[in-house]
Amino acid sequence: MRNFEYFTPTRVIFGKDTHLKIGTVLKEQNCRKVLIHYGSHSAVSSGLMDEIRSSLDEAGISYVTLGGVVPNPRLSKVREGIELCRKEQVDFLLAVGGGSVIDSCKAIGYGLANPDTDVWNFFLRTETPKACLPVGVILTIAASGSEMSGSCVITNEEGWLKRSSARNDLCRPRFAILNPRLTYTLPQYQTESGCVDILMHTIERYFVNIETMEITDSISESLMQTVIYNSRILMKETDNYTARAEIMWAGSLSHNGLTGCGTGGGDWACHQLEHELGGTYDVAHGAGLAALWGSWARYVYDANPERFAQFAVNIFDIPCSTDFNKTALAGIEAMEDYFRSIQMPTSLHELGLDLTEKEIHDLAFKCSFEDTRTIGVFKQLNMKDMEKIYLAAR
């Protein structure tokens, strides 16, 4: 196992109607003016924005609003937010939404607190942020875990590059308000895509090619089992509060570093491969991960079939054969069967993408930073490897 540091400064306020406390929570932050950042019109039409405004008015907190964040959040919206916040002298950022809104808020926070640096440089990782304006969250989509994480992902429309910032505790939200009822109105596809994203944040940390800690493995496996079980419930009962609550809390725990303790950080190849899909073709992140995972797993499992066999036995109750390869492959198939059971794609075709070999080559070229980097630690992947995985996923 590897040495590690575990730090979770985010205050979690969990449960029914907790978003109604937002005025009091922000007052405790001693902020003068808040940006309320949100995504689609649903935050307005549902009455959520009215409730937030009312709570802030009651607390005597000034605010401005900026909506229009889309999935795979855009750099142009980040720049718009930075300009607005400078003009309005905002000193706190409130994200009302899911991972895209939270990540957009974090990027705005970086841009405001580092005025002499182009914010995109933090995503190219050519510069490191020295500060970040504080961020708080009212979560409406359980998926990304960005409400407790120290990273964010932004898409630059120039070249359609989707890039993540380096992990940095500066951008971890000060607080996250988690009311499972706010996720009731999500479309089924978005709910289940979010469940895949939650699973993958733990899976990326689970599949490492080193000796891991038994306690971390047990936490990770329990979290994965919980997500699989409750995501199936939500296929039939979209307003099941208990299932929604389990999924929402799992989303936060899956990406706050807990399931990576002692693992050295994780593999993250599948995420890197999906970032090119999401940036280029604007697909839902979780669905893109589901479409790629089986091909990635079959390509790399032979680097440590025993680890994949452990996954198969402990997550899907597959009998352990003396042939670890056989058990490993059975586990990969079981995972794909699970994706199908929640109507998630297991190929690029099912994702709605029928890509040519040239288009796949271009994805691998971008993912490898023009053939200058490898990805993954379970098995290091160069550009040719990436291309083979994309091709196998067709």
Annotate each language-model stretch with its function:
Residues N114-T212, Q310:
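A glycine/threonine-rich phosphate-anchoring loop and its flanking beta-alpha core
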Residues L170, F308, I315, P319-R394:
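C-terminal charged capping/lid subdomain of soluble metabolic enzymes
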Residues R205, N209-A334:
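Active-site segments that bind and position negatively charged phosphate/pyrophosphate groups
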Residues E51-I52, I82, V101-P115, M148-S149:
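Short Gly/Thr/Asp-enriched flexible loops that form oxyanion-binding sites at enzyme active sites
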